[in-house]
């Protein structure tokens, strides 16, 4: 079995390739060619923390694996990662353990790739200004993926802890050469954006501003019914709400459950799964006036396909630590 660390994965990743693999996984899922149960969610430590168990089989892609992740929001106060995890791949023919990959970096990359795919199909082609609300680790992968699919000229950042936003602005400027600005008011930040990303652990909406025509939103933070990043009116007034999995999104996120309970949105008003848009079964953005929202909760098959990509790259480059059971 090959063990692949986060640092080793970092040197293997080509974001454009990861976006392609994520799109392939989404297409297979929406075509019902995978077995991807709704993930198990286990609250622990007085429900402050969450363990997520995410298995998947993709028959056509010959991939089998499981991801186990813990989300501990309080870790950031003691300088530790809020997301920890592992991904295990099994040999598709023999069922033997194939690889064990550090899971928090992989999660960041696949989260970014999902937003990259959504942005490719749903954002305006001439989108130039990106707003990111929440500047934790997940925002790094999302920014990189959006830069891969759109020619972004300006980045606007908002974070409750302002110094973290400034640190992220420096990261964006140094790594990507993009001008990045920290705003004190999330509503002002949202008002100026062509593409909005929310990646927080918020239980109440992170902005209240009415969305501008033509904007695209990637909402990736809310993964529990008790969590809500977007104001209900944003979901209600969007022209297209898109998800990875209708079943999972309706089961897991307050971003949809709350407006449904308030009578502002109906479950059958979800426009499409992202895989249906990739395959051409459903339309993506159709004009520059549409408001589009991609509500992401994650999807195990994407993790497994990205893990398989990293495993194959590791074999090619002789990277990783081989261990015997």
Swiss-Prot record:
Cited SUPFAM superfamilies: NAD(P)-binding Rossmann-fold domains
Covalent S-S links between cysteines: none
InterPro entries to which the protein is assigned, alphabetical: NAD(P)-bd_dom_sf, ODC_Mu_crystall, ODC_N
UniProt GO cellular component terms: cytoplasm
Entry GO MF terms: oxidoreductase activity
Keyword set includes Cell membrane: no
Catalytic activity: L-proline + NAD(+) = 1-pyrroline-2-carboxylate + NADH + H(+); L-proline + NADP(+) = 1-pyrroline-2-carboxylate + NADPH + H(+)
UniProt entry keywords in alphabetical sequence: NAD, NADP, Oxidoreductase
NCBIfam families the UniProt entry points to: PRK08618.1
Its job: Catalyzes the reduction of Delta(1)-pyrroline-2-carboxylate (Pyr2C) to L-proline, using preferentially NADPH over NADH as the electron donor. Is likely involved in a degradation pathway that converts trans-3-hydroxy-L-proline (t3LHyp) to L-proline, which allows B.cereus to grow on t3LHyp as a sole carbon source.
Family under the similarity heading: Belongs to the ornithine cyclodeaminase/mu-crystallin family.
The name this protein goes by in its record: Delta(1)-pyrroline-2-carboxylate reductase
Record organism: Bacillus cereus (strain ATCC 14579 / DSM 31 / CCUG 7414 / JCM 2152 / NBRC 15305 / NCIMB 9373 / NCTC 2599 / NRRL B-3711)
